[in-house]
């Protein structure tokens, strides 16, 4: 029997992970990035950009539930949601489950990502692209948040790592633009890497976001696809109370929402804001 091909992630030079490739479904270099989708017996369909795993069918629900339900339920009455990135449609899928949300705008820099994900990752979007509340904008995220006349209650930055096209979504210009189009009391969240291996990313984001928001922090989730431990999500708002809501308040909102989740629950919500001491120490040691 012929040995299966292997796909090796190239995010780190000295260590990493690989996937056995059962079948390559799509591989093309677009105007912005090198994109591949392949099948793996353990993780289902896997999508990678520029040599870095972005999502798998096996565990994507953890990432997307935590990126959406934490800010939306903490906010409590979000009507207008902005997603930066998220071309695979899974973030959109989770936001559409909130029936009180009136409009969902998604800004994706690469139209090719949206088109092939509709074809090759149908379980991710699960028909959410057809939701009447949804509007797709093909634009650079930094440009959009600094130019739009729209305002939002929750902004979700479903960004790649801060290399290549995703680098601009970790800049002060982007964070300032998000503050500009965020309604009073609104919440900004963003993917911020695996803090044990990418601690400098969290420190840099915390420093930059603190220039624009009065309450900046992080919450976490364990997502097997992202090599190295716990995935960290940046959190920023001017409503200092939202990060510290009791489990009882979140529980009441969760029950009222009718959500049925596979990872997220109210206890996970409040526990996710507890950070390991090494990260707390690193953040505390930074100059104000």
UniProtKB/Swiss-Prot annotation:
NCBIfam families: MFS_SpdSyn, PRK00811.1, speE. PANTHER family: SPERMIDINE SYNTHASE, SPERMIDINE/SPERMINE SYNTHASE. It comes from Shigella flexneri. Residues 9-238 form the PABS domain. The active site is at residue 158. S-methyl-5'-thioadenosine binds at residues 33, 108, 140-141, 165. Its EC number is 2.5.1.16. The gene is speE. Homodimer or homotetramer. This is Polyamine aminopropyltransferase. Spermidine binds at residues 64, 88, 158-161. HAMAP family: Spermidine_synth (MF_00198). It holds the Pfam family Spermine_synth. It is found in: Cytoplasm. It comes from the Bacteria.
């Amino acid at each position: 029997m012929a040995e299966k091909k292997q796909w090796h992630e190239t995010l780190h030079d000295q260590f990493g992970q690989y996937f056995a490739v059962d079948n390559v479904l799509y591989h093309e270099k677009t105007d912005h990035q090198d994109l591949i989708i392949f099948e793996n017996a353990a993780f289902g369909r896997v999508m990678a950009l520029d040599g870095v795993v972005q999502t798998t069918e096996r565990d994507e629900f953890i990432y997307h539930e935590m990126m959406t339900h934490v800010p939306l339920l903490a906010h409590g009455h979000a009507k207008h949601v902005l997603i930066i990135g998220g071309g695979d449609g899974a973030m959109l899928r989770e936001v559409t489950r909130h029936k009180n949300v009136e409009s969902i705008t998604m800004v994706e820099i690469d139209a090719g990502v949206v088109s092939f994900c509709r074809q090759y990752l149908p379980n991710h979007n699960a028909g959410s692209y057809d939701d009447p509340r949804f509007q797709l904008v093909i634009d650079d995220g930094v440009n959009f948040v600094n130019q739009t006349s729209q305002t939002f209650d929750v902004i979700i930055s479903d960004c790649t790592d801060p290399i290549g096209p995703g680098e601009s979504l970790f800049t002060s210009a982007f964070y300032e633009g998000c503050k500009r189009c965020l309604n009073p009391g609104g919440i900004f969240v963003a993917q911020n890497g695996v803090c044990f291996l990418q601690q400098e990313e969290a420190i840099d984001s915390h420093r930059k976001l603190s220039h624009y928001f009065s309450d900046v922090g992080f919450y976490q989730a364990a997502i097997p696809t992202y090599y190295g431990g716990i995935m960290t999500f940046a959190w920023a708002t001017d409503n200092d109370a939202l990060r510290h809501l009791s489990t009882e308040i979140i529980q009441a909102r969760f029950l009222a929402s009718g959500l049925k989740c596979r990872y997220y629950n109210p206890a996970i919500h409040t526990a996710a804001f507890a950070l390991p001491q090494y990260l707390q120490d690193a953040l505390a040691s930074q100059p104000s």
